Amino acid sequence: VLSPVSGPSETPVLGTEVESASVVPTLAVLHLADLFRNPKMRVPANRDWAKIGAYLRGDWPLPIPPRLIVGPERGYEALWGGQMAGLVERAVGAEFVALDTEYAPQTRLLHTIGVGWDSGGVVEGLQVLQTPHLSHVGRDRLTDILHAIMTQVPVVYQNAVGADLPVLEQAFGLRYADHKRVDDLMLAHAELWREWPHDLGFLASMYGVYPKMKHLAKQDPALYNWGDVLDTICAWQGVVKEMAQDPPVRQLYEEALQLIPILLESHKRGLRVAKSRVEPAIVEYQERLETALRLAWSYAGWKINLGEAQLKEQLYTREEF
């Protein structure tokens, strides 16, 4: 079933439930003929088609679980409430917690943090919004809460090295060494299925049991973040089961995990370079780039920007390559 989605043309996300203009629930999946072109997508396609039966039975998607939302509307007072103490107690008693951050990509300034867990089939969590508005006391309190959780229970991140761990250290001073254990969902899935995408949207299509929320980044940022937390929980539970059936892959994953602190430290230090060799090379290659640009302008007849989509337009639209 292909969805007649209105608006800008985009590649449909596998397993996305959307609504057309006539308000008909539609499940967007790969066309079966596409498997002749891309056979490696057979398993994801099978899982998507299997959702039809679950949908008709009312088993999918499941209702979105509740979470405690803490924000500036009430001065973040819930950080000190009795409900928070109960949440932390249940979090540290879970098998693992999933943690997801939302931040400004250029500055890594954190603005939303979500933590969720599955306690015997009951999924719940905590969300703190607009963290830059926290007072010093509130920030210290949130730091203590996060520290209490991560020192007592394994934490699963979607992308520990490339996103969440550096953001948490910048915002709260919480480091890799403060964790009981760090698990990386993207890394684990890459060990299992190297030929597939490893982004959270794809993983939600493969393992998710809740409505898609990846499209809510601007409409409802809080629900978008909570959706990432829920999808991380579901995907990690699925990946753990798959690794249990393939012990060599589990061993490879455990070995790869040992690189996380090394990579974090190397990202801080950067690369050591021989300036005496690099600086002259920069001048040489800059001259080559300028020459190439002038040649492109002369050939195209206009000041084409080789670093943007204009090159694609020139080659495929005008030259018809």
What are these regions (language model features)?
Residues 1, 98, 153-164:
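Acidic beta-strand-to-loop metal/phosphate-binding motif
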Residues 1-66:
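Glycine/proline-rich loop-helix segments at beta-alpha junctions forming the active-site rim
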Residues 26-29, 96, 123-128, 155, ...:
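Conserved beta-strand scaffold positions in the cores of enzyme catalytic domains, especially
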Residues 30, 99, 158, 183, ...:
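Active-site flanking residues adjacent to catalytic metal/cofactor-binding acidic residues
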Residues 33-38, 127-140, 180-225, 230:
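Short alpha-helix plus adjacent loop in nuclease-associated cores
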Residues 51-131, 220, 225-321:
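Conserved "right-hand" nucleotidyltransferase catalytic core of DNA-directed polymerases
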Residues 106, 113, 161-175, 186, ...:
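Short active-site loop/helix that positions an aromatic residue
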Residues 120-156:
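Nucleic-acid-processing active sites and adjacent nucleic-acid-binding tracks
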